[in-house]
């Protein structure tokens, strides 16, 4: 079904069965297959390929040569009807690739809202990405990676399968991430190592001084005080009930399966 207000360039192909919402703009030489739903106000500039099952939300902008919802590159994939779900108001720049999930996981790749994916970023199968994140040029997420809210992944970075990147993290360019990165942490390198708290980012996002100081104390317990992980968690737990941000930090440590960058 194509909404009467949608604008589709005559050189583009929209297969029968696709659902195209109000005020959607599909520029020249795009392809949208029959198992795709595109929400209100979303724009495909030109030469965009969207395969399905894929659901794209409202007011996204997808630039030329992006490949959205293609089959994943996992060798176990055997053509199952897995999905890609994208939220609202994302900017997806040139040559970005986002793949559908696999049945070995939950079968869904999920991208939240208000994210920026710069040129040539890659989101592999079964990734789960939060809101208001930035992925710089050539940032690469392997399968099953989870990224929290308002994280920044630097250009040319690569994140190993199953790694978790916490809320408000900042990864420097060229980083190779093979373990989980706790919330609020700045890290860089090969292999990626922590070098502080994303203080400037936290200030911009409205964290008050007391909360930031509490996060710093949690960071020092984990990285600067010479404690084992279990001892650090016990020390951090003393402030977890008073400060929600510290509780988030502690919960992340408790749930980590790949281990924490140290």
Curated annotation (Swiss-Prot):
UniProt GO cellular component terms: cytoplasm; membrane
E.C. numbers: 2.3.1.129
Gene3D superfamilies hit by this protein: Hexapeptide repeat proteins, Udp N-acetylglucosamine O-acyltransferase, C-terminal domain
Keywords: Acyltransferase, Cytoplasm, Lipid A biosynthesis, Lipid biosynthesis, Lipid metabolism, Repeat, Transferase
Annotated SUPFAM superfamilies: Trimeric LpxA-like enzymes
EC main group: transferase
Stored InterPro entries: Acetyltransf_C (IPR029098), Acetyltransf_C_sf (IPR037157), Hexapep (IPR001451), Hexapep_transf_CS (IPR018357), Lipid_A_LpxA (IPR010137), Trimer_LpxA-like_sf (IPR011004)
Example GO biological process: lipid A biosynthetic process
Top-level taxon of the source organism: Bacteria
GO molecular function annotations of the record: acyl-[acyl-carrier-protein]-UDP-N-acetylglucosamine O-acyltransferase activity
Position of the signal peptide: none
Family membership: Belongs to the transferase hexapeptide repeat family. LpxA subfamily.
Entries under NCBIfam families matching the protein: lipid_A_lpxA, PRK05289.1
Task of the protein: Involved in the biosynthesis of lipid A, a phosphorylated glycolipid that anchors the lipopolysaccharide to the outer membrane of the cell.
Protein name: Acyl-[acyl-carrier-protein]--UDP-N-acetylglucosamine O-acyltransferase
Organism field: Vibrio cholerae serotype O1 (strain ATCC 39315 / El Tor Inaba N16961)
């Amino acid at each position: 079904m194509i909404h009467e207000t949608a604008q589709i360039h005559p050189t583009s192909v929209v297969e029968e069965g696709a659902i195209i919402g109000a005020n959607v703009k599909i520029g020249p030489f795009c392809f949208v297959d029959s198992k795709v739903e595109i929400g209100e106000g979303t724009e495909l500039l030109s030469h965009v390929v969207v395969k399905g099952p894929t659901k794209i939300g409202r007011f996204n902008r997808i630039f030329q040569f992006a490949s959205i919802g293609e089959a994943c590159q996992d060798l176990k994939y055997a053509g199952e009807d897995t999905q890609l779900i994208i939220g609202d108001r994302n900017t997806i720049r040139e040559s970005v690739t986002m793949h559908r999930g696999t049945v070995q996981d939950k079968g869904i790749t999920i991208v939240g809202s208000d994210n920026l994916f710069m040129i040539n970023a890659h989101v592999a199968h079964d990734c789960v990405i939060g809101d208001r994140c930035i992925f710089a040029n050539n940032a690469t997420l392997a399968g099953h990676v989870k990224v929290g809210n308002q994280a920044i992944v630097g250009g040319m970075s690569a994140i190993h399968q199953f790694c978790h990147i916490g809320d408000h993290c900042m990864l420097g360019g060229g980083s190779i991430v093979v373990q989980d990165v706790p919330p609020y942490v700045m890290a860089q390198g090969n292999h990626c190592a922590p070098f502080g708290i994303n203080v400037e980012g936290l200030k911009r996002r409205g964290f008050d001084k007391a909360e930031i100081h509490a996060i710093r104390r949690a960071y020092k317990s984990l990285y600067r005080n010479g404690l084992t992980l279990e001892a650090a968690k016990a020390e951090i737990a003393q402030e977890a009930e008073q400060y929600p941000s510290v509780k988030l930090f502690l919960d992340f440590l408790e749930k980590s399966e790949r281990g924490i960058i140290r």
